[in-house]
């Protein structure tokens, strides 16, 4: 499945970056808001940074990607913790919906975005 391959790629990327990622779908199927919770310990072993990663994979050549209302709300409510991970090769887009709140009215259940527009704004994972 495309999505699981994408999640697996991001899990591996997070581990390579020194984070401790957890696949939320293994805890709760269709976890609302994000796919991966990734943590990093502080210098004294205490819980340090936390990030919530929503992973989007795609079938090769697909022009759009769909983001759910819950995913958008999570990104807007936790802008410094939220990362949208795009997986052809893995790229991270931080603050993906910043300045777009007027586009997401209450009745919206999901939004389609042009993959290339998101991809062009994304960066190498760090």
Stretch-by-stretch model annotation:
Residues 1, 24-29, 41-44, 72-75:
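Short, contiguous acidic/charged loop-to-helix segments that flank catalytic cores in large enzymes
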Residues 1, 7-19, 48:
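ASCE P-loop NTPase motor core, strongest for the SF2 helicase catalytic module
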Residues 2-11, 29, 57, 79, ...:
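Nuclease catalytic cores
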Residues 11, 15-41:
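A short acidic/basic microdomain associated with nuclease active sites
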Residues 14, 35-38, 49-59:
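Conserved catalytic cores of phosphodiester-cleaving nucleases, focusing on short active-site segments
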Residues 42-49, 92:
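Short, solvent-exposed loop/turn segments that connect beta-strands within catalytic domains
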Residues 55-72:
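Short beta-strand-loop-alpha-helix junction that forms the active-site gateway
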Residues 78-126:
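Domain-level recognition of nuclease-like catalytic cores that cleave nucleotide substrates
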